[in-house]
């Protein structure tokens, strides 16, 4: 391996003259008014930069009050050995609001009027690499966490850790991806000169932020942000297992190695291997095995299942899986399964059309196995053949026999829930009261007074509804182990709004209402157990995440924890007003660590508006 390292490094060291660096730039304005800042590179005014890089061009305009944080590229030239950011500023951070031009110089910010320029050398943000995947133009519009990750390096923001969330991948990597772990990664310094050979080196994880890690190359100062599910990240010794003869993979350090080793590669390699790799915790082969399993899904495109009608919750319809993305599935009602003319897709998001998007997690309360409606006597809107098919399934289950499914049916076993303790289940009674986040609402920022209306035959399922004259009309089936039901008194205890029953007059008090209705509360041990305090403490105000909008579930957005209410977090979608905030249980599959979308090639919606 030593010869390969020296040969490869010697071959390419002389062909690449500089390495790109990122500068985090903080611009402060003395005046308490919204100001405008336009940043242009040297190329804009015809000045000659000593090593022109056509990829580093363009300009951007930003608006903010008091302060803007952004980043720009610079070069580290081996010949000159210095860092150099570059750019023109046009700004109106002045007493009279008139625009001033300011050319940035490393030594001084004089002449900037009320503007102050502060620079920080930042780590490189590496885009996720997906081998053998076609490019998707939709992903050109996806939002990236680059700016916030650079702010994290300055201690100005943070993220909810992966281990705080409910399971959101089909494979769990929490135990192997940790700070201090050493792994193999691709060195892209050689890409232009090494078409048929992949060059790798070793790096150590310094910080973990969601599915992004801040890593540093062994034996170099270079740091970079990498998605752990990128095809650029490997367990240690992966190269030897993937390419035993090392015909297609070689090891070589990044070009920006520590200066004292640039002319002594033998000592450099020995120091890296003996001093920083041998005996250290490394990313195991199980990591690579786990990544390979991510492409294997429990379900398949074309399978049919039963889907609750979100606009008429007393009805179930037949739907097909159109796309699969990790645990999330795009499902829709198709002409193939519907007994009448399909509703207009503009009025019904669950109906298939060329652009239909109805994305839900595989554990969503909206979906049921084939035969659920027949087993439980629930209203089913389907073709005659399907109804007859599911009636046979229901009869087989009733007789204790194995049902005969079609090959494309999603079965009860595929959507199985955890068993319920029979002793606890006996405590459940029709009429018992609880508090509910309405999963069919257009707003998810309060709780409602609700009741158990009836039992389903399928174990653990109930028909529930919000108290009031429309309780039956708006009722729906749900498994007792869910993220929407909470015990009586939860809203008051955790400072949330409790919506009283429709047509209720006066001030609502639970004790008075229960006495008036001659009702009792659903016992505490029927609800999901409260997570440990250690886990709840990982959800702090100001931490960032990705969240699926429960009103329009095809959209996953960058978001921030605004407040914490026991096991519920109030989430604000970045750039949106607080009226659009939504409450999520910490076990919800609709909240995700940062980096989930890019890891699954799913579009992360940009914030509605930028202020940096």
Curated annotation (Swiss-Prot):
Keyword terms: Chromosome, Nucleus, Repeat
Deletion phenotype: Multivulva phenotype in combination with loss of function of class A synMuv genes lin-8, lin-38, lin-56 and lin15A and with the class B synMuv gene hpl-2. Reduction of brood size and defects in the development of germ cells. Loss of function results in suppression of mat-3(ku233) mutant vulval phenotype.
SMART domains: MBT
Effect of residue 253 to S: In allele lin-61(n3624); does not affect binding to histone H3 trimethylated at 'Lys-9'; multivulva phenotype in combination with lin56(n2728)
Effect of residue 368 to S: In allele lin-61(n3736); reduces binding to histone H3 trimethylated at 'Lys-9'; multivulva phenotype in combination with lin56(n2728)
Gene3D superfamilies in the cross-refs: 2.30.30.140
One of the GO biological process terms: negative regulation of DNA-templated transcription
Molecular function per GO: chromatin binding; histone binding
Effect recorded for residue 549 to A: Reduces binding to histone H3 trimethylated at 'Lys-9'; in isoform a
Effect in UniProt of substituting residue 475 to N: In allele lin-61(n3447); reduces binding to histone H3 trimethylated at 'Lys-9'; multivulva phenotype in combination with lin56(n2728)
Effect of residue 580 to A: Abolishes binding to histone H3 trimethylated at 'Lys-9'; in isoform a
InterPro entries: Mbt, PcG_chromatin_remod_factors
Extent of the MBT repeats: 143-249, 263-380, 381-501, 508-607
Subcellular location per the Swiss-Prot or TrEMBL entry: Nucleus; Chromosome
UniProt subunit comment: Interacts preferentially with histone H3 that is dimethylated or trimethylated at 'Lys-9'.
Entry remark concerning the domains of this protein: The MBT repeats specifically recognize and bind histone H3 di- and tri-methylated at 'Lys-9' (H3K9me2/3).
Cited function: Synthetic multivulva class B (synMuvB) protein required to repress the induction of vulval development by Ras signaling. Unlike other synMuv proteins it does not associate with the multiprotein DRM complex and the NuRD-like complex. Interaction with methylated histone H3 is essential for vulva development. It has a role in maintaining genome stability.
Protein name: Protein lin-61
Organism of provenance: Caenorhabditis elegans
Source organism phylogeny: Eukaryota, Metazoa, Ecdysozoa, Nematoda, Chromadorea
């Amino acid at each position: 391996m030593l010869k390969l390292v020296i040969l490869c490094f010697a071959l390419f060291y002389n062909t690449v003259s500089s390495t790109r660096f990122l500068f985090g730039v903080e611009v402060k304005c003395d005046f308490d008014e919204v100001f405008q800042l336009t940043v242009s590179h040297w190329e804009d005014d015809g000045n000659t930069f000593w090593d022109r890089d056509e990829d580093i061009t363009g300009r951007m305009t930003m608006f903010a009050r008091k302060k803007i944080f952004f980043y720009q590229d610079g070069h580290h030239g081996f010949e000159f050995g210095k860092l150099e950011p570059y750019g023109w500023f046009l700004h109106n951070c002045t007493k009279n609001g008139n625009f001033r031009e300011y050319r940035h110089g490393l030594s001084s910010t004089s002449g900037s009027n009320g503007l102050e320029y502060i620079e920080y050398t930042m780590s490189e943000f590496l885009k996720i690499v997906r081998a053998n995947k076609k490019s998707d133009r939709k992903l050109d519009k996806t939002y990236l966490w680059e700016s916030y990750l650079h702010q994290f390096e300055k201690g100005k923001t943070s993220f909810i850790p992966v281990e705080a969330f409910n399971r959101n991948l089909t494979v769990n990597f929490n135990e192997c991806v940790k700070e201090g772990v050493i792994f193999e990664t691709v060195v892209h310094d050689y890409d232009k000169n090494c078409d048929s050979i992949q060059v790798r080196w070793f790096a150590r994880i310094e910080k973990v932020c969601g599915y992004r890690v801040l890593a540093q190359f062994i034996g170099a100062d270079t740091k970079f942000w990498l998605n752990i599910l990128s095809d650029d990240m490997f367990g240690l010794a992966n190269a030897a297992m993937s390419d035993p003869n090392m015909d297609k993979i070689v090891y070589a350090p990044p070009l920006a190695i520590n200066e004292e080793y640039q002319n002594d590669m033998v000592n450099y390699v020995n120091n890296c291997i003996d001093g920083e790799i041998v005996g250290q915790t490394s990313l195991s082969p199980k990591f690579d095995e786990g990544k390979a399993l991510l492409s294997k899904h429990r379900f398949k495109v074309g399978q049919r299942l039963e889907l609750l009608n979100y606009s008429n919750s007393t009805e179930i319809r037949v739907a097909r899986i159109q796309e699969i993305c990790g645990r999330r599935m795009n499902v829709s009602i198709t002409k193939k399964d519907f007994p009448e003319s399909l509703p207009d897709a503009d009025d019904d998001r669950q109906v298939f059309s060329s652009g239909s998007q109805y994305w839900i997690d595989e554990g969503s309360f909206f979906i049921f196995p084939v035969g659920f409606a027949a087993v439980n006597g629930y209203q089913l809107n389907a073709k005659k053949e399907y109804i007859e098919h599911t009636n046979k399934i229901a009869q087989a289950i009733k007789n204790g026999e194995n049902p005969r499914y079609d090959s494309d049916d999603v079965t009860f076993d595929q959507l199985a829930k955890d068993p319920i303790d029979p002793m606890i289940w006996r405590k459940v009674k029709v009429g018992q009261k609880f508090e509910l986040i309405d999963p069919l609402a257009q707003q998810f920022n309060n709780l409602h007074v609700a009741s158990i209306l009836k039992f389903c035959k399928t174990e653990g399922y109930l028909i529930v509804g919000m108290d009031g004259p429309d309780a039956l009309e708006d009722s729906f089936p749900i498994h007792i182990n869910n993220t929407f039901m909470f015990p009586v008194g939860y809203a008051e205890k955790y400072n949330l709004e409790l919506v009283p029953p429709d047509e209720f007059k006066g001030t609502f008090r639970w004790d008075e209402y229960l006495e008036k209705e001659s009702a009792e509360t659903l016992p505490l041990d029927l609800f999901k157990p409260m997570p440990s305090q250690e886990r709840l403490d990982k959800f702090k105000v100001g931490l960032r995440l990705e969240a699926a909008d429960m009103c329009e579930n095809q959209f996953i957005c960058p978001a921030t924890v605004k407040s914490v209410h026991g096991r519920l977090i109030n989430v604000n979608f970045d750039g949106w007003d607080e009226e659009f905030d939504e409450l999520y249980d910490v076990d919800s599959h609709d909240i995700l660590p940062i980096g989930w979308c890019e890891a699954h090639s799913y579009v992360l919606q940009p914030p509605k508006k930028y202020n940096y």
